[in-house]
């Protein structure tokens, strides 16, 4: 049988040769064709998959499942395959056709009719969604494609298109194995075939799945939707659905009555989303899911919090009270952005389930990769490699789903090994409008969901005014995700009963649509009338259900009036229980020394300079690098790459998970890291030495990302949310490219704690340095990060005992520019040893990675050593500070240029150079000490960046606060410019020489006023 599996590649040519000679047309193949086309053509009205292959595999499984003419043909073809005969024998039907012309004609007609029916079935499967009745308003087609399949409109059109006649409607036809409309029946009349196909594909559900290039997956979907009677619900299921609709609609009505002038972005017009989400959760819980992480925009968010996550109603209602003050630190956020974390019993499955709704900004779809990253992390911490315990649900708006590029970026993470969450259920609230924009002006694709086709995700469109259809589709979506570990999209085609918000007037821009909406009967009334008519519920029971929920809301409203303050921490989406306390008491504001024993440094270094696997051949160039590392270990020195290796390795020893992600991070953009070794003789055989340090170490993940900043940084941010006991780093290929992810930086990283009381310890590694490489490979834009830092330039702090750590606790993020590998080592370790978590922004070097002066001794990393916020002058100038004429402050790589120039001019005793390693929060205490140490010296700030960029605008007012404006801080650096760097090498060197000359010209500032 295995040999027969090779036949499909030859079937097209054989069919043409065997049958064309006898005037039996099959698939329109040309008799002169000597080989099959690149893709076997389908029958008329079909799609891209080979119909003949499907028939062939069906015959292999059961010869009686196909028509006898096909049985005969495949038998002859298989005999030829085994015998190797050059002249294939025709099928028996061909022998019979020779005996009589009438028999031949009859057989030809029989085959053609059966092929036509197969084609008709396939056409429905491929294109039935184009004519499905999806719009509750009946205004627009479900899609914006002007193409309407003429073969799927009327019975006459169908028959004519397939060369069938009305007399054929009552003929019985054998059903192919690619459909399940027959149920237990193998044959149906053409009339019944059409009726069942219409019911499956052209009513309130539109299915897009035939583009999926996996027969098993297509068959699974066909069976779920085509099998007769699959959408039958019990009375109890219908009553549950009605009760959920009542809660969804009455919640919105209650808010509208109590706070008619408040923005709440209600769900009216898509109330079915609440039972839809609950169905996905119920079904997933039934299949073993224990943790569901949701991301969604503002539309319907309060309803989801109340009726899906089950947030206490009084806490939601408190958010509408303008008189309540927040009890927590931070600025807070509007109510329809807040998140939530809740563990409860799922009433349907009677199992525990944890639900998280991730807080998000107004920037639509920005939360998508964050949710995926958090989901991936939760799966890791639960040992859930297959995604059977933790899953994500993403809710989208139609305009944003089609319009926001981060949706595409997130989809393309879905099947990458280090980023996959084993499938996400996407729910699109397709209200057919984007604020005021008509969908025909908002996208170029027929559907808002077409972006999902790039990852072969099935798309289930459904009319939101048919609650039972919605619930069934959502149940299937949950099953799909559990079965195939792939994404799936549910497109809820609905409408928006009010404007974009409750104060908005939609009639200005959509008059016809809103005239129809005003006439539209709410879905709750439609469904209640249906159930009452069929006797599932009585009118009295329905009214009692409404009264019951109204009473719940009123009671919660009364309790909300007793609240005196708001607690933002009650809306935390990612709590870290036990992290901020020790034995019930808050952790002290201290940080232990970050150095480690020398034997640990040596051990990590030896692993970093070797290959832990046998028979593993590495590149000769890499062998030189490893030998160089080994030499450094012998000499007790480290460069940048080794310092990073030692920081990571020591944390792994302490049980801290480390994850490094970004473009080309495995090797490193500048070929310095080499954390993944590649066997030069075995394809895709790799080794990560960092995972071979200790038997009981934590795992290390280093993964090259897709070529995305926005999506990947959002993912890593979400990953870091899940646990404080992990060092999660994202490295930009060049620091310049971080601005493609600016939304994540602005809306989540810099402001996340202030808005949502959510700590996060993510680390951003941003290669930065002016080296003549042009305006897009030079600057990580430090000025932008410093502008968003929240420390007060005019407030002179009190230097308490715990000032250093308290200052870190009060800031919104930490910004550093290390000039030594040792300090880089320490700041990475400090990030984990702090008693809290803050984002860490590190401007990392490029040329310093191999700079001979940027190698430092183990002595600066051993036990008892720590991160230096400021590195003072330690040369001749420091030994005679009273003779120093100028004190230059700087940060980062420019220090080495300054030291070289000072040496060349012999000014070591006249000019002191102090390095600012931690820029924000500003080290007021240490800078004050340095300035006072050199009372007779001019003070200057030197930077390689242009004056309107870099650090000067940040440090200058803080120096003035320290110095009480008694001494100026002069600027030394490049002039203001529009672009961050020149692309001309000569211009770069000229400007470098110019500001270095100024830095050491001791008369440069004479006669100038500050």
From Swiss-Prot:
State the taxonomy lineage.
Answer: Eukaryota, Metazoa, Chordata, Craniata, Vertebrata
Keyword Transport in record: no
Any one annotated GO CC term? oxoglutarate dehydrogenase complex
- UniProt KW Lipid metabolism keyword: no
Question: So what does this one do?
Answer: 2-oxoglutarate dehydrogenase (E1-like) component of the 2-oxoglutarate dehydrogenase multienzyme complex (OGDHC) which mediates the decarboxylation of alpha-ketoglutarate in the tricarboxylic acid cycle. The OGDHC complex catalyzes the overall conversion of 2-oxoglutarate to succinyl-CoA and CO(2) while reducing NAD(+) to NADH. The OGDHC complex is mainly active in the mitochondrion. Involved in the inhibition of cell proliferation and in apoptosis.
Q: Alphabetically, which GO biological process terms does the record hold?
A: 2-oxoglutarate metabolic process; glycolytic process; tricarboxylic acid cycle
Q: Which domain of life is it from?
A: Eukaryota
What chemistry does it catalyse, as a reaction equation?
N(6)-[(R)-lipoyl]-L-lysyl-[protein] + 2-oxoglutarate + H(+) = N(6)-[(R)-S(8)-succinyldihydrolipoyl]-L-lysyl-[protein] + CO2
Subunit composition and interactions:
The OGDHC complex comprises multiple copies of three catalytic enzyme components, the 2-oxoglutarate dehydrogenase (OGDH/E1), the dihydrolipoamide dehydrogenase (DLST/E2) and the dihydrolipoamide dehydrogenase (DLD/E3). OGDHL/E1-like isoenzyme may replace OGDH in the OGDHC complex in the brain. The presence of either ODGH/E1 or ODGHL/E1-like isoenzyme in the complex may depend on its tissular distribution.
- InterPro entries in alphabetical order: 2-oxogl_dehyd_N, 2oxoglutarate_DH_E1, DH_E1, KGD_C_sf, ODO-1/KGD_C, THDP-binding, Transketolase-like_Pyr-bd
Name what cofactor the protein needs. thiamine diphosphate; Mg(2+)
Q: Please give the organism.
A: Pongo abelii
Principal location listed in the UniProt entry: mitochondrion
- Binding-site residues, Ca(2+): 130, 143, 145
What GO molecular functions are on record for this protein? metal ion binding; oxoglutarate dehydrogenase (succinyl-transferring) activity; thiamine pyrophosphate binding
Task: Point out the transit peptide region.
Answer: 1-73
Family note: Belongs to the alpha-ketoglutarate dehydrogenase family.
Which residues bind Mg(2+) per the record? 398, 431, 433
Q: Which UniProt keywords apply?
A: Calcium, Glycolysis, Magnesium, Metal-binding, Mitochondrion, Oxidoreductase, Thiamine pyrophosphate, Transit peptide
Q: What is this protein called?
A: 2-oxoglutarate dehydrogenase-like, mitochondrial
